[in-house]
């Protein structure tokens, strides 16, 4: 059985995964049901699983071809082993995403569905309405990076946190901690450290400006 979680934590995850698929003005968002959000989140996860497995498959093929063509070259053997290792890592990531997709409906059923839907819609609506302001705030604190060059999931985790802090009166510490947890679940190995660093700079920035 999936563990019981706080409604707002589930809502953040639901909003994160649904952002790319749920668009529209406030009046349209009001008509979006919890099932619509859940379906959008599961579609996003399964699409990511498919993309990750395709990448892993390509790495396996490349590694196999190198082994087949250059069996006696030590450097090529090492390169092929690295490709296979990378493919295994990607496959594990895909399995984790698939597990998330499978357990997500049960997690929502165990929570207060009204609270989950209301906060997820509030987050999505706030980001849609204030996207320009949110992105400008993030661009101001991204050192040697451009927001658009970050992984899409990292962009959206950052937007969620900034939206909460600037517009939804969520305490900075709470929002940053929740963003870090989302990054641990959905970003790459170093993603959560990067997210934490950017958001710390953001909170310092707004205090001094």
From Swiss-Prot:
Record HAMAP family: NusB
Assigned GO CC terms: cytosol
One example GO MF annotation: RNA binding
Family (UniProt): Belongs to the NusB family.
Keywords: RNA-binding, Transcription, Transcription antitermination, Transcription regulation
Protein purpose: Involved in transcription antitermination. Required for transcription of ribosomal RNA (rRNA) genes. Binds specifically to the boxA antiterminator sequence of the ribosomal RNA (rrn) operons.
Gene Ontology BP terms: DNA-templated transcription termination; transcription antitermination
Name recorded for this polypeptide: Transcription antitermination protein NusB
Organism listed in the record: Crocosphaera subtropica (strain ATCC 51142 / BH68) (Cyanothece sp. (strain ATCC 51142))
TM region positions: none
NCBIfam families the UniProt entry points to: nusB
């Amino acid at each position: 059985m999936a563990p019981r979680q706080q409604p707002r934590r589930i809502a953040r995850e639901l909003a994160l995964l649904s952002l790319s698929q749920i668009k529209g003005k406030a009046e349209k968002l009001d008509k979006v049901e919890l099932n619509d959000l859940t379906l959008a989140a599961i579609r996003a996860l399964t699409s990511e699983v498919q993309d990750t497995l395709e990448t892993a498959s390509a790495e396996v093929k490349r590694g196999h071809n190198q082994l087949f063509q250059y069996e006696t070259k030590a450097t090529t053997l090492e390169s092929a082993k690295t490709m296979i290792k990378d493919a295994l890592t990607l496959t594990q990531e895909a399995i984790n995403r698939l597990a998330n997709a499978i357990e997500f409906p049960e997690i929502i059923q165990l929570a207060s569905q009204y609270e989950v839907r209301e906060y997820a819609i509030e987050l999505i609506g706030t980001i849609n309405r204030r996207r320009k302001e949110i992105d400008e705030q993030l661009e101001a604190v991204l050192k040697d990076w451009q927001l658009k060059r970050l992984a899409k999931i990292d962009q959206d985790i950052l937007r969620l946190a900034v939206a909460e802090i600037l517009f939804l009166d969520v305490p900075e510490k709470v929002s940053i901690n929740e963003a870090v947890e989302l990054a641990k679940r959905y970003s790459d190995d170093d993603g959560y450290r990067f997210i934490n660093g950017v958001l710390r700079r953001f909170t310092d920035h707004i205090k001094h400006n």
